Regions:
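Catalytic histidine neighborhood in serine/cysteine hydrolases
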Residues: 283-293
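An N-terminal hydrophobic leader/cap segment in hydrolases
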Residues: 9-82
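Conserved alpha/beta-hydrolase "acid-adjacent" motif
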Residues: 271-277
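Alpha/beta-hydrolase active-site loop
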Residues: 147-168
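The serine-hydrolase catalytic nucleophile loop
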Residues: 109-123, 136
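Conserved alpha/beta-hydrolase
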Residues: 123-143
Length: 293
């Protein structure tokens, strides 16, 4: 009798542990900090359908590299704030001659100060904009162990806006400009109290929610289209280890509260963050808005 009970129990336990292992691996891959790790040569076990911004195949490699080199040549001021959960966060401030406005740049997933926003930073600087390159938690020179897909980054963006406002003696208008996860964080931050000098938001290819983005990533990277159990496990690890729930990384409530104008734009062929995310954010937004796809 005992043997009959032990066998199915052992099978169920093995299945449970196997599923838990999958959930842990997914959490470790998408949420845990990978800064400083050396990539090992190994056989690919998943394929991405999108191309990196600086890949020669997309035609922007030269512009990308030139813009990044330009950023590295500029003299910038190191800036630091303490996040609401005690992390030391880093940014670089680039002043412009006769500045007319200040733009806070919020980079994307696993990005850093001089990544895919380098070209836009150069353009903004040449058009009389002071630029603050923030580095999100777990990226660049900022502290942190986990990427929270906007759940905590939204508060960091708010803190940076306050930091800039307190030092903005000329009361120049401030704009929040985010890309990908950075755009989602900017949109989420708009639901909180921001300085009066913040006059508008720019959201480049931002996602609408972490849960939706996880579904898209699972389908795109691993060809997994039905993952309710995996999402439950991921959320459990996020709560237990990283101190947030996936529902905390969602733009819906912020878009209902936001009163500042928002420019949404998205590449129609984006396969990393699908264009329907910007359309959803646009539809949720109750403030003055424009969508360009």
């Amino acid at each position: 009798m005992k043997k009959k009970l032990i066998r199915p129990f052992a099978i169920l336990l093995a299945v449970f542990l196997g599923l838990l292992e999958v959930g842990w691996r997914f959490f470790n891959m998408v949420v845990c900090c990978k800064r400083g790790e050396h990539k090992k040569e190994r056989k690919k076990w998943f394929e991405l359908s999108h191309i990196r911004e600086n890949h020669p195949r997309n035609g922007y490699a030269r512009v990308y590299n030139e813009s990044k080199a330009w950023c590295l040549e500029q003299k910038m001021q190191d800036c630091y704030i303490k996040s609401i959960d005690g992390l030391k966060l880093h940014a670089l401030y680039l002043p412009a001659e006769d500045a007319k406005r200040i733009v806070i740049l919020s980079h994307g997933y696993r990005g850093s100060r001089f990544g895919t926003l380098s070209f836009m930073a150069k353009y903004l600087h040449e058009h009389q904009c002071d630029v603050l390159f923030i580095e999100h938690r777990c990226c660049g020179d900022s502290e942190g162990k986990y990427i929270t897909f906007g759940a905590k980054e939204q508060w960091d963006v708010q803190q940076w806006a306050v930091y800039v406002s307190e030092r903005n003696k000329e009361k120049l208008p401030i704009y929040l400009y985010g890309q990908s996860m950075g755009a989602a964080a900017v949109l989420m931050a708009s639901g909180h109290t921001l300085p009066a000098e913040v006059k508008g938001l720019i959201a480049d290819c931002g996602f609408q929610s972490m849960e939706g983005q996880m579904r898209d990533m699972a389908a795109n990277w691993f060809h997994l289209h039905h993952i309710p159990l995996l999402l439950i496990e991921l959320d459990w690890f996020c709560s237990l280890l990283a101190g947030f729930h996936m529902k905390d990384a969602d733009t819906a409530e912020a878009m209902k509260k936001n009163t500042r104008p928002v420019l949404f734009f998205h590449g129609e062929k984006d396969t990393y963050v699908y264009p329907n995310n910007s359309f959803q954010n646009y539809m949720l937004c109750r403030a003055e808005k424009e969508l360009v796809i």
